[in-house]
């Protein structure tokens, strides 16, 4: 039986997530939230109604592994453990939070964290995304991740998901709300403008 001082117990197996939109990424530098341990982390926004059969299999494998580590660690299944409302699980409905990109009740999100090692990030051509080109990986883009599942009872009790490595899959609108100058002006080219020589002194 796990005791109140037992550290988090991670599984050794790695699983692959379905595609998700990236939210709150801290993958190039560690960040601390609410005074907690600094760690590399991000939140994935998943849309199960859009899953392919392969995506569903990956999703089910993650849920199954969470159930297995819960049973192994606490000797009880997740359903039983959830009778204690303080028991933490990683999955949350999209309408539980009021952030940009959230609000959809059909969306499910969970956070992934790794306090020790910066995740490796690749693009679809298997080229690395590093701190030097970090703008390529941003809140709002699509990615997938390798993860592991673990149970913990050091600070509260629950099951959670650890972050392995990441692959960016595609671009999308940034959750930060910023656009590039090319996006702003590229669809409306300037033709025949030479700068002009009008007297603008009346605008001073």
Functional labels for PLM-detected ranges:
Residues 1-109:
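OB-fold ssDNA-binding interfaces and closely related basic DNA-contact patches used
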Residues 1-16, 173-204:
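Acidic, gly/ser/pro-rich intrinsically disordered tails
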Residues 39-41, 107, 142-146, 158, ...:
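Broad gene-expression machinery/nucleic-acid interaction feature
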Residues 43-45, 111-113, 146-148, 165-167:
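Residue-level recognition of well-ordered beta-strand positions that form the cores
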Residues 46-50, 149-151, 170:
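Beta-strand elements of well-folded, non-transmembrane domains
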Residues 98-127:
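Catalytic core of the SET domain in histone-lysine N-methyltransferases
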Residues 122-142, 150-160:
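Exposed beta-sheet edge/beta-hairpin loop segments within beta-rich domains
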Residues 153-173:
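OB-fold/S1-family single-stranded nucleic acid-binding modules
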């Amino acid at each position: 039986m796990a005791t109140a001082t037992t550290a988090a117990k991670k599984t050794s197996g790695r699983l692959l997530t379905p595609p998700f939109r990236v939210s709150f990424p801290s993958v190039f530098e560690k960040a601390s939230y609410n005074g907690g341990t600094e760690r590399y982390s991000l939140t994935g926004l998943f849309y199960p109604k859009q899953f392919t059969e392969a995506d569903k299999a990956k999703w089910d494998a993650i849920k199954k592994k969470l159930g297995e580590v819960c049973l192994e660690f606490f000797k009880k299944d997740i359903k039983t453990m959830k009778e204690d409302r303080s028991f933490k699980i990683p999955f949350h409905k999209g309408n539980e939070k009021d952030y940009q990109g959230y609000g959809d009740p059909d969306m499910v999100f969970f956070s992934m964290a790794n306090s020790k090692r910066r995740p490796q990030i690749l693009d679809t051509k298997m080229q690395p995304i590093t701190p030097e080109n970090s703008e390529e990986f941003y809140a709002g883009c699509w990615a997938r991740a390798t993860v592991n599942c673990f149970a913990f009872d050091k600070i509260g009790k629950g099951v959670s998901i650890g972050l392995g490595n990441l692959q960016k899959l595609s671009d999308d609108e940034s959750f930060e709300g910023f656009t590039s100058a090319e996006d702003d002006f590229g669809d409306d080219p300037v033709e025949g403008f030479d700068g002009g020589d009008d007297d603008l002194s009346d605008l001073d």
